[in-house]
C-alpha cells in the first residue's frame, strides 16, 4: 500500500507476538494484491484495465468492498467517490458481480478506504489472539488503538504539522478506537479533490477524525478535506464519530 506499518503489541510473550506479527504481515500482503491499483498483479489493477472494455468479474471480497464504497458515496452525499471522475459511469451487475465503466477516464481508487479496511482486518487478528493492548500505526495517518497506554488511561496521539515536522498541532486520545488524518501534504498538495468541481480545498491542510470504526474514520477525514461547512455537519451526522479536528495552519 506504499507505506509502512508499525505495531506495538503489549501483554504477549515473544512467541505469540511473533505469530501475530506474521499474520498481520501476511494479511497486508494479501490486501495489497487486491486493493493496490498501482500493482500490475493486483485485482483492482485488472479491474481498472478491463472494465473500460467489457464487464469485469470481481472476487466476493472486492465486490463487498465496492458495495460498501457505494454506501459511503451515498452517506457522504457524493463527496466520497472512488471513481475519481463520475460515479454514475460505473455500472455494477448485482447478479453477475461484474463492474463496467461506461466512459473513458474512469479509475477505481481505494486510497481513501484501504488503510481503514486493513486496520479493521488487523483488529480481527488481534482480537482472535486475545490481544487487548496494542497500538497500530499505518503510515502515520491511520491508527488503531486497543486498550490504553501502560502508564495512562488512553493512548495520546500527536498530530504533526506536515509543513513543520517538529511542530505538533494537536493531540487526540484513543482507547479502543481509531484515528485517521488526511491532508494536503507538501509533496501531495491537492491529491484530495472535490469530485463535483475537480478542485481541492486550499483552506484545509489537515483533518483528523477519531471513530470506533477505522473505515468510517478514513472516509470521513477524506471527505471533510473537501466538503463545505454545511455539508461537513451533514456528513458527520451520518456516522458515529468521537471527535474531529480541522486544521487550516
Describe these PLM feature segments:
Residues 1-249:
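Mature catalytic core of soluble alpha/beta enzymes
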